[in-house]
Structures are given as structure tokens and as C-alpha cells.
Amino acid sequence: MKLLSLTTLRELARLSLPMVVSHGSFAVMVFSDRWFLAQIDSVHVAAAMGGGVAMFFCISFFIGLITYANALVAQYYGAGDFHKCSKVVTQGFLIALMSLPFLALIGYGMGQAFDHLGHDSTQVSLEQAYFYTLMLGSAFMLLKACLASYFAGIGRTQVVMITDVLAIFVNIPLSWLLIFGKFGLPELGIVGAGLGTVTATAFAIGLYLLFYLARDHRAQFSVSKSWGIEPGILRRYLRLGTPSAVESFMNTATFNLFLLMFQSYGVVQGAAMAIVFNWDMLSFIPMIGLNIGVMTLIGRFVGAGDMARANQVISSGLILSLGYTGTLATLFLIFRVDLINVFATPDEHFGEIRELASIMMLGLTTYMMADAIILICGGALRGAGDTRWIMFTSTSVHWLMLIAQYFVIVKWRAGPLVSWWVFVVMLISLAFIYAARLFRGRWRQPERLARVMQE
């Protein structure tokens, strides 16, 4: 069978485009919150970055585990075991509920850790307020992630898109009202941004449940018979999902520590990084939608035993991702100063922030296509169950980067641009390693795939 098929390309685009819109909507939600906060001052922007990343660090292990439901559901769907798809959701809900005591302990510890990171005292209090607000809604985030992964796994990505887009229309006006205290509501500042996010997440869960409990869906996927522990599915969930969870946690830990070390340069440097990562997010997060589309189709074809179609999915994913990121990188390069000025703040430091962020945007345009390769190759490998290799490789590269950052920032006290380019080189290196694994093909050996499908 030919390596590239227009039919497969269209199928991938059909599945992925709603997920691109969905994840793009999340990027818009975060982007708008930070734009609102930029109207206050640059400290609020830096604090939202620090508090938001710290929250994701705390839930990253459980998010990584729960969202592997996507690949599991896709594999069962490809094998024709529709009744097992809904059982994956139940196991995911159980995992989410069991995670709550751990999240409470981790959240308390992380909240106290802000006092010892060397940040400005004003920034610390804002980071803690935003972090604690988001952590109160962490259970909602896990349940929402499970339901979104399920609908992506069965190929109904339009449900995910509709839900997330509608959630934006709750989040953005609510955050504006609560941040600035409009129409008689209290002026909550950064806490208002957090409450807007939590409320929108709870609203999204309600929408997902409307689709999940609809009569036709209940009948096709035997939802009424899915409530209960299924030891075989749960074991497979944990066996394949735990490496993804460890990878997610460790990589988030290294990124979080890198971010916190970088912010020790000062408020100007922290705000410059926050601005650059806001634009990075608008390019990277929609690409996660394509990553999910690739993972879903690879999982489906692994379940169906059709590896020839899997090859076409990989080729199609690379064409779409490199075309998208290449175009966006060119625009970011040409208009980088104008993009930075979107986040102009009224304080006197913005000139310094703009100068540093302009140079950092060059690094962003350099690594955007590496991100595309990482996401497509990683999605294919995860969909085929090669999660242990990804865990060891990705974790090792990220921790090597962090060790290098420790020497650059703490020991040698080199400038922020040296630290930034170390980060860029790490991403480019990881892209080469992922591509080598994918195209060498050990992950597709029949005996390996047979083990992946075992319960």
C-alpha cells in the first residue's frame, strides 16, 4: 500500500481539526486571562505563568494516566469491542477519584514551596492565590480530561470541540467580570481568573455528560453495563498508562523547575518568558489536537491489525504539522515585535521586557517545527503502546536539560539568553531522537503489538 493516501489524510484532518479547534480554544482561554491580567501589571502576568504551571505540575501524573484512555478506547474501537470503550471511562473516573487525597497533599506542599523560590514577595502572594484557586478545581480537570479522551478515542471529536468552544463563552466573560469587578461583582484580580477557569471546566463536564448519556450513545457503547471495576481493563490501563503518567509528571517537573529557575533572573525576565510562551501556546496547543488525531488512528489500526494504514497516518500527520508550524513560524518571525506589544503593560519596565522577548521569539521560531515532529512521532508511538520507551527517553532528555540549566543559571550565572538557547537545543535534540525511533520500526513488531493488546 502507498505511503501517502488522500483518504487517510482527509480522515486524519476530519478527526484532528475539531481537536485543533478544541485545544486552540483552551489556548485562547488562557491567553485572554493573561491579557486581562496584563492590564493590571507585568507581575500579574508572571504570577499567572508560575501559578498555572505549578498547578499543572501537581496534576500532571494523573492527567498523563487518565488521558491514555484515548489510545485504549481507540484500540478497543478498532478491534470492534465497543462495549469495552465505555468501561475505560469508568476506570478513568475511579482513578480520578482515588487521586484526590494525593492531590490535596501535593497541592499543600507546592503552595508552601512558593515561599522558598526567591521570587519577589508580591509575585509570590499572587502565584499562591492563583495556584490554590486552580487546585480547588483539579478534580473537575481530571474528569473532563477522561471524557474528552474517550470521545476522541471513538472518533467523535466534534463533541470535544463543541464542548470546549462553549466553555470559552463561559470563561472569558466570567473572568473579565471577576478580575475587574464589573456589574457589582467583587474585584478579585488573579483569583477571578482562576475562578473563571474552574467554573468553565465544571460547565464542560456537564456538557460531556449530556452527550455521554444520550440514548443512542448508551445503546451503541453499552454504557448502562459499564459501571463497575473491570480488572482486566484496569490492569491494562495502568500498565500502558503509567509510563505516560510518569513521563508527563517528570517532564512537567523539569519544565516547572526550569521556569522557576529562569524567573529568578527577575520580574522582567519572567514576564518576557510568559509573553513568549503565550505565543508558543497558541502554536503548540492546537498541534496537540493533531497529536490526538494521530494517536487515535494509530490506536484504531493497531486494534484492527492494519499497520499499512498506520504508515499513512504518520506521513499525513507530518505533512499537516510541518506545514502548519512552518507557516506560523514565518509569521512569528516577521511580526514578533508586534506580537509582543499585544501584552504591553502600563509599567516602566516594558521596554526591557520587549527587548528580551524579541530575541527569545527567535528561539521560539527555531523550535516550533521540532515540536511538530515530537508531537506526531510521540502520538504514533503512544497510540501503538510504546509508552515505556517514550517515558525513559523523554524523561532522560528533559532532566539532562535541567542539569544544564542549573549550571547555566545557578552555578555560572550566565545570562537569560544562554539559558533560553539551551532549552531550544533540548527540543531539537528530542525531535531527532523521536523520529529515529519511529522510522526504525521496532515498535511495530507483531509480538510487541500483541503484548500491547493483552489485558
PLM regions with names:
Residues 1-19, 73-139, 185-242, 298-366, ...:
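Short alpha-helical transmembrane segments in multi-pass integral membrane proteins
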Residues 3-35, 39-40, 56-72, 97-104, ...:
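N-terminal transmembrane alpha-helices
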Residues 37-56, 122-129, 190-191, 232-240, ...:
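Interfacial/gating helices of multi-pass transporter permease domains
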Residues 66, 70, 134-152, 160-168, ...:
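Short runs within selected transmembrane alpha-helices of multi-pass transporters and secretion channels
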